[in-house]
């Protein structure tokens, strides 16, 4: 038993993952710590919802790793859904080795709720538009290792009463029995229901934002050097000393003004010069270049310098107003060009869409017509076959009608011949019968004569017998 427990503890220790984290506003104070998580290898890959697939020795504490920075606290509370009522507290921390992401430690009111939450949200996407999935791990313990900052975090004396903190939004007590508590990255605590109504990712108290600004890169080659931004649409591209994607954007869209991000100077591709220092002359209304010493370029009046600071400020403000007005006019003209450009694009898209719809309709009609033509050809062939069959049947009918007529004639002739033959045979039979009767009468007469001569002494009884015999013979002839 002891060896089995030792082996189980060693296998569990092999599956423990150590993650270093920090929290707090780095400008004020930062708390560092380490948390021990049960790695994914300890969790069974089976899709069964049974708790037997979960690691042994787990606690009602889980960690959501790698939450995107663009996901606000309200978004995450909405993602948790109905499980929010089983959460005691949530703490947002910053991972040391992961950029633009944060992690959340969640403690539940029971192990059953923790297991259900783990099985339901493990590997689930945060939203349908984001490819990031929820990576959940069970946490064994969380340890704070140190603090660095300008604020002294000394522990209060244990002798005095400790006042329970309140929510900065609703000013109610932060009690886990009444609702879950969420601690932000800057170590400010709120009710989950209160922070769910906060629209952005900043802290409602100190406005610390966990989402850091992104570095500008070229939208094509992703370089970070020699970048120019289009003044009209904001597209960032690299300059001519790299791959020239900013100039290519001007050639494609005709947006001629581009801002150099490093020096904040504006370049005009159409005029092939800088336009950020152009002002309008009051004498003739022409655009002239602003001198760095506060003087104007030669416009027929020579150059002037002002020693009065008030006059210099007024002139500078006037020049700034003129530059702003000129910039607004240029921007309006570019916006009008942009409008025409996109209207043209929309018209082209509309025409292409109509053309595709027409082609699809023509293709569908052509396929339908082809099917109907195939069916028509099959029907024509079937009709021709039936006509040929009918013609053959008509011909066969005539032939067989002739044969039947001939057979009837032959049958009539045969019957007539048989009748004639039978009639002739009957006549022959009658003659033969008559001849036989005549011969029998002649023979009887001769016998009578012979009997009369030979029996002269017959008695009356014998004569009676002779008479009776003659009657029988006569009857037989008649029969």
From Swiss-Prot:
Pathway: Protein modification; protein ubiquitination. CDD domains: RING-H2_BRAP2, RRM_BRAP2_like. It comes from the Eukaryota. Zn(2+) 2 binds at residues 230, 233, 249, 255. Residues 469-479 have a biased composition (Basic residues). It is an enzyme of class 2 (transferase). A zinc finger (UBP-type) spans 201-294. Residues 434-479 are annotated as: Disordered. One of its GO terms (molecular function) is protein heterodimerization activity. One of its GO terms (biological process) is protein ubiquitination. Residues 328-442 form a coiled coil. Keywords: Coiled coil, Metal-binding, Transferase, Ubl conjugation pathway, Zinc, Zinc-finger. A zinc finger (RING-type) spans 167-207. Residues 451-466 have a biased composition (Low complexity). It catalyses: S-ubiquitinyl-[E2 ubiquitin-conjugating enzyme]-L-cysteine + [acceptor protein]-L-lysine = [E2 ubiquitin-conjugating enzyme]-L-cysteine + N(6)-ubiquitinyl-[acceptor protein]-L-lysine. Disruption phenotype: Viable heterozygous plants seeds are slow to emerge from the seed coat; emerged embryos remains white with unexpanded cotyledons thus leading to growth-arrested seedlings. Pfam families: BRAP2, zf-RING_2, zf-UBP. GO terms for cellular component: ubiquitin ligase complex. Component of the heteromeric E3 ligase complex made of BRIZ1 and BRIZ2. Forms heterooligomers with BRIZ1 via coiled-coil domains. RING-type ubiquitin E3 ligase that binds ubiquitin and is required for seed germination and post-germination growth. This is BRAP2 RING ZnF UBP domain-containing protein 2. It comes from Arabidopsis thaliana.
């Amino acid at each position: 038993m002891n060896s089995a427990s030792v082996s189980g503890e060693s296998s569990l220790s092999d599956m423990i993952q150590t993650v270093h984290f920090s929290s707090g506003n780095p400008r004020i104070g930062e708390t560092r710590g380490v948390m021990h998580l049960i790695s994914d290898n300890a969790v069974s890959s089976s899709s069964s919802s049974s708790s037997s697939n979960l690691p042994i020795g787990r606690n009602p504490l889980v960690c959501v790793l790698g939450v995107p920075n663009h996901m606000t606290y309200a978004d995450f509370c909405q993602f948790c859904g109905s499980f929010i009522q089983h959460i005691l507290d949530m703490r947002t921390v910053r991972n040391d080795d992961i950029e633009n992401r944060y992690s959340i430690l969640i403690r539940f009111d029971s192990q059953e709720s923790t297991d259900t939450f783990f099985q339901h949200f493990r590997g689930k996407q945060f939203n349908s538009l984001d490819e990031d999935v929820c990576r959940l791990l069970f946490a064994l313990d969380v340890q704070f290792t140190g603090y660095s900052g300008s604020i002294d975090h000394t522990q209060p004396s244990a002798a005095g009463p400790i006042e329970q903190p309140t929510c900065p939004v609703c000013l109610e007590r932060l009690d886990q029995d009444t609702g879950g508590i969420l601690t932000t990255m800057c170590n400010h605590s709120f009710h989950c229901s209160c922070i769910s109504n906060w629209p952005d990712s900043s802290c409602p108290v100190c406005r610390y934002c966990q989402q850091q600004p992104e570095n500008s890169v070229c939208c094509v080659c992703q370089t970070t050097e020699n970048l120019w931004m289009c003044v009209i649409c904001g597209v960032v591209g690299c300059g001519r000393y790299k791959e020239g994607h900013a100039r290519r954007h001007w050639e494609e869209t005709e947006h001629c003004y581009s801002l150099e991000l490093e020096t904040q100077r504006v370049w005009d591709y159409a005029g092939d010069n800088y336009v950020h220092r152009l002002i309008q002359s009051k004498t003739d209304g022409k655009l002239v270049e602003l001198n760095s010493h506060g003087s104007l370029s030669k416009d027929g009046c020579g150059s002037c310098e002002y020693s009065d600071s008030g006059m210099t400020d007024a002139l500078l403000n006037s020049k700034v107003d003129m530059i702003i007005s000129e910039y607004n006019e240029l921007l309006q003209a570019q916006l009008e060009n942009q409008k025409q450009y996109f209207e043209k694009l929309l018209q082209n898209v509309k025409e292409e869409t109509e053309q595709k719809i027409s082609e699809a309709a023509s293709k569908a009609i052509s396929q339908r017509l082809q099917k109907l033509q195939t069916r028509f050809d099959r029907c024509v062939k079937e009709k021709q076959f039936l006509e040929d069959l009918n013609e053959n049947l008509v011909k066969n009918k005539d032939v067989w009608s002739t044969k039947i007529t001939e057979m009837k004639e032959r049958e009539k002739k045969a019957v007539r011949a048989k009748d004639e033959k039978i009639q002739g045979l009957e006549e022959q039979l009658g003659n033969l019968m008559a001849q036989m009767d005549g011969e029998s009468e002649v023979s009887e007469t001769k016998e009578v004569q012979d009997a009369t001569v030979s029996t002269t002494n017959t008695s009356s009884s014998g004569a009676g017998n002779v008479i009776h015999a003659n009657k029988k013979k006569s009857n037989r002839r008649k029969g």
